[in-house]
């Protein structure tokens, strides 16, 4: 029988949006506060979805082993790091949520039967990557409230 299991991990890191081919004014215009010299940080939440057969012990994979690989390959390297410098992929590419999710996939794919990577930059903003080259999905959630009147036209406001 097949099953998808999910493992959650967290790390805190900072990053900066800056393209060397653009001038300082162009970077500031394109990226606003994200282009500040010292960057800015996030508390990232990572979900790794893995797919496989349930073995005789009732597991797809030993989650303790999964935890150790994630720490070795991802969170142990990124936690409290400056993403633009920690991984070489981000020296030439912006460390956007989408790109970070893609690179995490590339680093974990040799170890696991990955189905999906979800990386939350904040509760309302996350990227989802499923291993299809650069087709990452970026989702932004929002909330709104509206007042409305539920009444019959024949009733007065007081009724």
Listing of model-derived features with the role each one plays in the protein:
Residues 1-159:
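Charge-rich, low-complexity N-terminal segments
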């Amino acid at each position: 029988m097949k099953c998808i299991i999910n493992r959650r991990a967290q790390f805190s890191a900072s990053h900066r949006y800056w393209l060397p081919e653009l001038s300082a004014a162009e970077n500031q215009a394109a990226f606003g506060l994200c282009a500040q010299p010292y960057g800015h940080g996030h508390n990232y939440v990572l979900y790794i979805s893995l797919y496989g057969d349930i073995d005789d012990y009732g597991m797809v994979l030993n989650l303790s082993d999964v935890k150790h690989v994630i720490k070795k390959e991802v969170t142990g390297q990124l936690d409290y790091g400056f993403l633009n410098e920690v991984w070489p992929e981000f020296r030439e590419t912006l460390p956007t949520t989408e790109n970070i999710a893609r690179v995490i996939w590339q680093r974990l794919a040799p170890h696991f039967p990955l189905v999906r990577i979800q990386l939350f930059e904040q509760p309302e903003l996350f990227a989802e990557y499923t291993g299809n080259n650069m087709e990452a999905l970026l989702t932004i959630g929002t909330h709104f409230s509206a007042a409305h009147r539920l009444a019959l036209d024949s009733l007065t406001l007081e009724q």
